[in-house]
Amino acid sequence: MGIAESTPDELPSDAEEQLRSGEQQLELSGRRLRRLPGAVCALGRLQKLYVSGTGLRELPEEIEELRELRILALDFNKLERLPDGLCRLPRLTRLYLGGNRLLALPADFAQLQSLRCLWLEGNFLRRFPRPLLRLVALQSLQLGDNRLRALPAELPRMTGLRGLWLYGNRFEEFPPALLRMGRLHILDLDRNRLGGFPDLHPLRALRVFSYDHNPVTGPPRVADTVFLVGEGAVERMAERDEPTPRPRARRPAPPFEDEEEEDLLIGGGGAGTLGRPGVSLRALEAAPGLGT
C-alpha cells in the first residue's frame, strides 16, 4: 500500500517494515504527502526521518514528540512555515529545509542547541534569521539561493561556524561581519553582485573561498593556503605556487578538528547528497586535503 492510498494518520506498510528491521530510521522521501502521517509522531525512539520531495505543506506540532530525533530531512517540499514543535527536538543535529517556501524561522528556533548542520538553501529569506545567532554549536550553514542583502553585525557570535554558503543571494558589498569570522574554513559567495573584496587575511582558518560569477576583475587578497574559485583564481594560485630563489615554508591551513566535522562541512550527510552541484563542490573536491 503506497502513501497515496493511506489515510493521513497511517504509516504505509513498507514504512512499518523499515521499523521492524530494528533501525530507528524512516524513509518517506519521494512519496505524495501533503502532511506528515500522525503515526510518525508516535515513534518516540526514531532517530532519522527523511521526508524529502513529497509535496509536504505542513508539519504537526506533535513532531516535538520525536525526542530522540538526530537527523530530519524536509527539503524540496512546499513548507511556508515551521511549527514551534519542531524547535523542541533536543537531540537534533542535522536539519535539511532547502527548496521550500520559507520567509522566516520561528523565534524558538534558537532552542535547537544541538544543531550542527542546517541547510536552508532555495527559500525566500530576505533577512538573516536572527534566531540562528544563538546557535553557537552550528558548524555548517547553507543559505544559498535566498534573497539576502546583508548580514547582522552579531554574526561572529556563531563561534562554531566552519562552513558558510551564501551563493545566489543579493549582496552588493562584502558583508563586514564576515571579516570577524576567523574560524571559517569554507566561504561561498558565488553568484552575488559583489564588485570587490577587502583584504581577507583576517580569515586565518579559511581553506576554500568561492567568489565566481560576481562582477569583480580579479581575486581577493588571501593567505597562500586558500583554494580560490573565481575570476583570475587559477592564475593567482599558479603564481604563488611558482618556485622562488628563496622559498618560504608555507604553514598548512588548520585541519578539520575531526572526521565528523569534515563530514558536516563537505558531505553534510543529508538525503544522499554531497552539497550543491556546481563549481564550488568541484572546488572542494580539488582542494588539497578536502576531497571526499
Where is each model-derived feature located?
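The feature captures the LRR N-terminal capping module
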Residues: 1-144, 150-153, 163, 176, ...
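Conserved active-site motif detector
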Residues: 181
